[in-house]
C-alpha cells in the first residue's frame, strides 16, 4: 500500500527489453534506498513494482506486457524521470489517501492554467464510464500523487497544485498532451459500485 505522498523523482538509467516483459533500471537517491531489499514494493508513477535487483544506486524492476500496455511506463525512455514512493510501513503518517498502486486507466493533460502561487491542470479521461468515480472534492491519484479533485466537466476534471507538489513531483514538468496514470479512490469505487448494483437489483 502507498499514501500518495511522492518522495521525489528518479531517472530511468536503462531499459532492457526481454521476451514478454521489460526490465527497467532506476537510479535512486540514498534516502530512497534506505533499508531497501529485493522483493520490496516501490511505486513508479503510481505503479506498484517489485524490486528485482539492487546494484549500488541502481534498482531494477520487471514490468509485464499488461503493465506496459495500460500505464504510461510503456512509453518512458532512458533519461526520463518517474515519481517514486516507497511502500508504507506500520505507523506511517497517511498524508494523502490509501493507494494500491494498481492503475485504473490513463488520462491526457488537456490544459494547464498557471497563476502566481499554484497551477491548475485539466485531464481528459478515455471514457465517460470512468467519470462516475471522479467526484468534486474527492480523491484521485495522478502518477501516484494523492490529489483532491477541484472541478468535473463531462469527461474532464482538474486539480490545483501548490509549489511543493510541482517541485517534488513530475507535475512541475508536465505539458499539455502528456499521458498520466490514474488510480481512482478505492472507497469511492466501492460506494459507487455498491449503489449502482443495488439500484440495478431494484430495476431503477
From Swiss-Prot:
Enzyme class label: transferase
EC number: 2.5.1.9
GO terms for cellular component: cytosol
PROSITE patterns in alphabetical order: LUMAZINE_BIND (PS51177)
Record flagged with keyword Nuclease: no
Role description: Catalyzes the dismutation of two molecules of 6,7-dimethyl-8-ribityllumazine, resulting in the formation of riboflavin and 5-amino-6-(D-ribitylamino)uracil.
The protein, known as: Riboflavin synthase
Organism field: Haemophilus influenzae (strain ATCC 51907 / DSM 11121 / KW20 / Rd)
Classification lineage: Bacteria, Pseudomonadati, Pseudomonadota, Gammaproteobacteria, Pasteurellales
